């Protein structure tokens, strides 16, 4: 009887369940979208119960549609949209407020106040993160401050906090396990990444009671079992958890110090495994935990690009220059260059290494001869320039020259982007056969814990290269193009509307 690992990939717009066999191949996929809530400008929220029902639905569907029995599931791995915050009543199981999503800016005033009080460096030193609404800690404080009676309930021990992984494990285990893993804990602004425990000083600054917080566990461990009524009467081990970007790093088999992966999703996320060393960044990168496994924690440097694949959606839906995302490749390759056009897609500001929230998108170098093809090509190239910005920051901070870049996410199907990426960073770009690396990483973590795979070496054999893109551009051309990009970014930052 063939066994499988069931991976739950709980994302920002949809929940998916993916079955993996022992070769790391996909045996079935189910997906369900759920509603986004925007109660005020800049606020983004989800209904945590709706997320839970979407996860139940895709688990059921992937098993039923692929003629798999529940007793063929060797273990469950969970990967999740990071930072999104749920606070719920531990007796009723009901959330006391919507889940506040990682994108939501509703805690800006809390962050500003803590900065004004001089605590930014304290948070940076202990957590490796910036004091930003992106992370979970200020979201918990906001809920406790703004939901009537919440603070009193929390102090009485009646409320629980969790990121989405914690919420799902608690529900799947029938309220038995209130846990998170090192990678998710490291995104809360409340976890000391050096001492590997919740930090009392930070909790005091955020006024968050410690009794709300989950127990922090390794990323690969049996945390509990599914309660029988949620899983066809079976008690299946819940055995792997990691935040989405860290799961992708693991799914790309980036196990060695200096290994790097880049995800081209709605935004872009680059992570470098820095081994057992938490590298302090001087270049606007985040220091975070990659994963904890076998009693050992691996750290990572992370760079965030706010607009990556969403720039292609903008070409399609906003400007109507293309009918489908793949069409952008054929337009881009009809011309040999952009003829000096640069697109800086700072629609919501600039991420690493600039961290300029006030910058807005700009286009430079237009002439009467500029055509649609040049514009589309310049937009695609912007993904690659931003990636080089992050990679240079990583090399500078870590002292490691990146030897190859493993890639995943929707935009990696675009061969033009992959080749230009290799050219502009002067590094080989490796596209894997299985591009569902986030879900695969969660499956690998769960599989290790239940003995489905024996070791990381065993897993690395399952990583297969689909195509390698080697740099072909000469150095003079590469540096000239990149200098133009840096000038365009500088001009974008100078021009700001009031």
UniProtKB/Swiss-Prot annotation:
Keywords: ATP-binding, Glycerol metabolism, Kinase, Nucleotide-binding, Phosphoprotein, Transferase
Post-translational modification: The phosphoenolpyruvate-dependent sugar phosphotransferase system (PTS), including enzyme I, and histidine-containing protein (HPr) are required for the phosphorylation, which leads to the activation of the enzyme.
Top-rank lineage group of the source organism: Bacteria
Positions annotated to bind glycerol: 82-83, 134, 244-245
Phosphohistidine carried by residues: 230
Pathway: Polyol metabolism; glycerol degradation via glycerol kinase pathway; sn-glycerol 3-phosphate from glycerol: step 1/1
UniProt protein name: Glycerol kinase
Gene behind this protein: glpK
